[in-house]
């Protein structure tokens, strides 16, 4: 999934939620431009855990892109977060399965979102039909 976002003044985080079972069980990938930090958070039974974080080097523009994808490589699930087109964070986690997606703002900041879209990632489907020989 990917979204363009503008984070307003104040202290807080904005981003996407995914793997949502309910309001007590989900993942979130959130950016905090005031601290220049990107975090991947796991919430299980209402308990928040930061499972990965990385420093950001934001471009001097108002709008930024945040993309998150979940990959499976040899039965290991990875969450990859991209900020402004660059892979910024990759974490391995299998605690939560698939679920709903959405947008999130936490703290005293405001945010504007645009061009939010999601698509399934098929890693085992061929890009072309089998050869005709």
Which stretches of residues belong to each language-model region?
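Surface-exposed loop/edge segments in extracytoplasmic proteins
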Residues: 24-26, 47-53, 86-91, 126
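Beta-strand-rich interaction surfaces with strong enrichment in secreted/lumenal proteins
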Residues: 16, 28, 51-58, 91, ...
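Ligand-recognition surfaces built from glycine- and aromatic
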Residues: 93-133
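Short, aromatic/His-centered strand-loop micro-motif at the edge of beta-sheets
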Residues: 44-67
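Secretory/extracellular carbohydrate-interaction modules
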Residues: 1-43, 106
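Short, solvent-exposed beta-strand-to-loop segments that form ligand-recognition rims
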Residues: 55, 80-105
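Short beta-strand/loop motifs in extracellular/secreted proteins, especially
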Residues: 12-14, 27, 36-38, 70, ...
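Short tryptophan-centered beta-strand motifs in secreted/extracellular beta-sheet-rich domains
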Residues: 1-3, 61-73, 77-81
């Amino acid at each position: 999934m990917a979204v363009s976002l503008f984070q307003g003044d104040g202290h807080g985080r904005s981003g996407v939620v995914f793997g949502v079972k309910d309001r007590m069980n989900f993942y979130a990938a959130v950016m905090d431009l005031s601290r220049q930090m990107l975090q991947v958070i796991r919430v299980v039974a209402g308990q928040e855990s930061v499972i990965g974080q990385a420093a950001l080097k934001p471009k001097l523009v108002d709008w930024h892109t945040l993309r998150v994808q979940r990959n499976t490589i040899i039965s290991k699930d990875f969450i990859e977060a991209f900020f402004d087109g660059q892979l910024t964070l990759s974490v391995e986690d299998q605690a939560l399965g698939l679920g709903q997606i959405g947008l999130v703002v936490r703290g005293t900041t405001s945010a504007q979102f645009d061009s939010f879209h999601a698509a399934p990632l098929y890693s085992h489907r061929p890009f072309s039909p089998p050869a005709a020989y």
